[in-house]
């Protein structure tokens, strides 16, 4: 939630001089009460800031330009208290580059049947003023969201809050820097993609670094800093005998701490908030970064394995979106299946890199064990399971002419049986609507084998994100029917081809 404290959403009231000073004074007074009420009672993640009433095209244009250049402003929330002729908004909306939410509300909840007169009617014109504003948005093909409801309604609060989270994530996306240590895993297709196209679409940049650049920083870490981090490990986790003092793999734990400190310093020095590694590019490192990656994800960094920069960026963006919510968000991979009639399950995991924010255990196990991939020393890692609850897996892929997001809703379950020989963190879930349908749909749509797994975010967040980023979205949930899903793939292909002309 700390990420949101410095951010603002500007609350903008549109009107016109036609109504006279007394009506405009009352509009301003009502707006102040609405903003104060929302800030105090709606549990919104981002503060609303009331801006001066805009009544002319020049005022609207100036405000939109100002919003573009204020880094702490993540978007505009507009309310048409009275009628605001929408031609006045064309100039401002033409230049606006921040997310826009139209709050279709009114000051009073109910009609004052006994006292309502024409003065009241002229003051409270959201019902048609909002439609005028909506027309110009549609006419300009302006991507904006609409929330309808009274400003004291809890459902409206929830929807505004979700929009704020997505707006903050989009702001993060525009300034995000992703570091790739090494390259993509050789011969893997889905982790490739158009980095220039991604920067144009999402705003984030992706830069490659040789392992020598990283190892130079890792090698410079002092023994004192390593010892201090080891003390933190011993307080936070259940260490196995192998990594305790004088244990057979104690040095592996010391090496992991050194890698963590070096990676974090490298990322901080470069202003990176997401990164990738690749087990085929480990020259100069003593082990594949496992514990380091897990702990950096827990601190909010995005990560993708095998050079998967799209998933690394998406994880960081979703972590920002989920700030302060219960439940965690992690890098994930569908690893293996349990095909059992009536109990089909997916075991999600990775070689090492699963984020502890999704851990069920308060103190995960910390161990160093053999890893047959990478050809390095036994890597340290945290081992835990994941609590039951509603979850989702999200993936962004490059289709060549567009970016496609897939979201599969899943139901995470308690681990049904012990896994005494599995030395990695994991989550176990039932895919919606079934493993058979979900896997077939995912494969038909080209979904990646890497995903972002979240128990903090829901489909509303992801749908909003796709809409506000203007990317394709395919949802796999309990409503999915394969013949309809295949039709959607065909229709989308035509739609996006036409849109690209």
Swiss-Prot record:
Give the cofactor note text: Binds 1 Mn(2+) ion per subunit.
- Keyword Metal-binding present in the record's keywords: the answer is yes
Q: Which residues fall in a coiled-coil region?
A: none
Record-annotated residues binding Mn(2+)?
306, 333, 350, 450
* Transmembrane regions: none
Please give the biological process terms from Gene Ontology that the record holds. Answer: L-arabinose catabolic process to xylulose 5-phosphate
> Which key words tag this protein in UniProt?
Arabinose catabolism, Carbohydrate metabolism, Isomerase, Manganese, Metal-binding
Catalysed reactions, as listed in the record = beta-L-arabinopyranose = L-ribulose
Main EC class the enzyme belongs to: isomerase
Record InterPro entries: Ara_Isoase_C, AraA_central, AraA_N, AraA_N_sf, Fuc/Ara_isomerase_C, Fucose_isomerase_N/cen_sf, Lara_isomerase
Which EC number(s) does the record attach to this protein? 5.3.1.4
Q: What pathway is this protein said to act in by its record?
A: Carbohydrate degradation; L-arabinose degradation via L-ribulose; D-xylulose 5-phosphate from L-arabinose (bacterial route): step 1/3
Annotated family: Belongs to the arabinose isomerase family.
Q: What does this protein do?
A: Catalyzes the conversion of L-arabinose to L-ribulose.
State the protein's name. L-arabinose isomerase
């Amino acid at each position: 939630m700390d990420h949101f404290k410095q951010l603002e959403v500007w609350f903008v009231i549109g009107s016109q001089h036609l109504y006279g000073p007394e009506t405009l004074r009352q509009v301003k007074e009502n707006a102040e009460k609405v903003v104060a009420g929302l800030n105090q009672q709606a549990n919104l993640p981002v503060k609303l800031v009331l801006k001066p009433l805009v009544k002319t095209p020049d005022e609207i244009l100036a405000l939109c330009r100002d919003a573009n250049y204020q880094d702490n402003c993540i978007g505009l929330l507009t309310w048409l208290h009275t009628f605001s002729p929408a031609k006045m908004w064309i100039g401002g909306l033409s230049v606006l580059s921040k997310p826009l939410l139209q709050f279709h509300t009114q000051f009073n909840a109910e009609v004052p049947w006994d006292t309502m007169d024409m003065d009241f009617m002229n003051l409270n014109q959201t019902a048609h003023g909002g439609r005028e504003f909506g027309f110009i948005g549609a006419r300009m093909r302006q991507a904006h969201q609409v929330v309808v409801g009274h400003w004291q309604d809890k459902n409206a609060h929830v929807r505004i809050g979700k929009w704020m989270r997505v707006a903050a994530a989009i702001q993060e996306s525009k300034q995000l820097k992703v570091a790739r240590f090494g390259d993509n895993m050789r011969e893997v297709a889905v982790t490739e993609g158009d980095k220039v196209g991604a920067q144009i679409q999402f705003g984030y940049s992706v830069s490659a670094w040789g392992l020598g650049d990283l190892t130079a920083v890792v090698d410079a870490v002092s023994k004192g800093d390593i010892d201090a981090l080891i003390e933190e490990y011993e307080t936070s986790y259940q260490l196995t005998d192998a990594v305790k003092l004088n244990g057979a793999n104690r040095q592996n734990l010391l090496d992991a701490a050194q890698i963590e400190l070096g990676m974090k310093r490298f990322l901080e020095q470069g202003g990176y908030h997401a990164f990738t590694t690749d087990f085929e590019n480990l020259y100069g490192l003593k082990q594949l970064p496992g514990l380091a990656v897990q702990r950096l994800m827990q601190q909010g960094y995005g990560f993708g394995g095998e050079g998967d920069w799209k998933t690394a960026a998406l994880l960081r963006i979703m972590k920002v979106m989920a700030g302060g919510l219960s439940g965690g968000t992690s890098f994930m991979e569908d690893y293996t299946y349990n095909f059992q009639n009536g109990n089909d399950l997916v075991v999600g995991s990775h070689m090492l890199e699963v984020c502890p924010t999704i851990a069920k255990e308060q103190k995960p196990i910390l161990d160093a064990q053999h890893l047959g991939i990478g050809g390095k020393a036994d890597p340290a890692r945290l081992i835990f399971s994941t609590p039951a609850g509603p979850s989702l897996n999200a993936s962004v892929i490059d289709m060549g002419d567009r970016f496609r997001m897939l979201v599969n809703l899943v139901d995470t379950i308690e681990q049904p049986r012990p896994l005494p020989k599995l030395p990695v963190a994991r989550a176990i879930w039932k895919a919606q609507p079934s493993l058979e349908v979900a896997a077939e749909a995912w494969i038909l749509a080209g979904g990646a084998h890497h995903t972002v797994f979240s128990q903090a975010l829901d489909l509303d967040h992801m749908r909003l994100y796709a809409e506000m980023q203007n990317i394709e979205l395919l949802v796999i949930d309990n409503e999915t029917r394969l013949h309809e899903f295949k039709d959607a793939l065909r229709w989308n292909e035509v739609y996006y081809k036409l849109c690209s002309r």
